[in-house]
Amino acid sequence: MNQISPLAYVHPEAKLGDNNIIGPFCFIDKNTVLGDNNVLQNSVTINRGARIGNNNEIFPGASLSTKPQDLKYKGEETICEIGDNNSIREFVTISRGTASKGTTIVGNNNLLMENMHIAHDCVIGSNIIIGNSTKIAGEVVVDDNAILSAEVLCHQFCRIGGYVMIQGGSRFSQDIPPYIIAGKHRLK
C-alpha cells in the first residue's frame, strides 16, 4: 500500500506500484510510471514521461523528466527512464529526451549528488557517482562505474568511459576513454 501525503498531488492517470512513500508537496504528473518501494521526500516533481523503477530515494527539490532545454524540442512525447536503487539528491534535474533519441536513461545503483543536471537524451549507466553541481549536457553517454566529482562540466555529445574518475572542477568537450583519471584543467 502506498503512503501518499494529503499535501501531495498525484495525477489520476499516473501509474504507481506498491509501497511507495510520497511526501508533502510532491507533484506526480500524468503519463508517469513509478515502480515499487520508492521514497519521494517532500517537494519532488515527477513530470510526464517519467518511468521510474524500484527502490529509489528522491530528495527534496528534485525535478525529473523535465522539458528538455533544447530549442529543437517541439513538445513531442518523450521519456526519462530511471532504473532501480538510485539515490537522487536535493535539486537534481533530469530532462526527458527529444526527437533525436526520444529517451534519457539513468541506470541502476547511482548516486546523483545535489544540484546536478542531466540533459536530454543522455545515457547514464549503473554504479556511477556524480558529484554536486556537475552539469552534463545533451546526448552524453557515461559508462558504468564512472566517478564525476563536484562541479564537472561535460559538453554535449561526449562519452565518458567506464571506471573513469574526473577531478572536481574539470571541464571537457571530448570523449574520455575507460580507466582514465582526468582532471583540473580543460581536458582536450
Q: In which residue ranges do the predicted regions lie?
A:
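Structural signal for interior beta-strand "rungs" in well-ordered beta-sheet cores
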Residues: Q3-G183
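Conserved beta-strand-loop-alpha-helix hinge in the C-terminal portion
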Residues: H185-K188
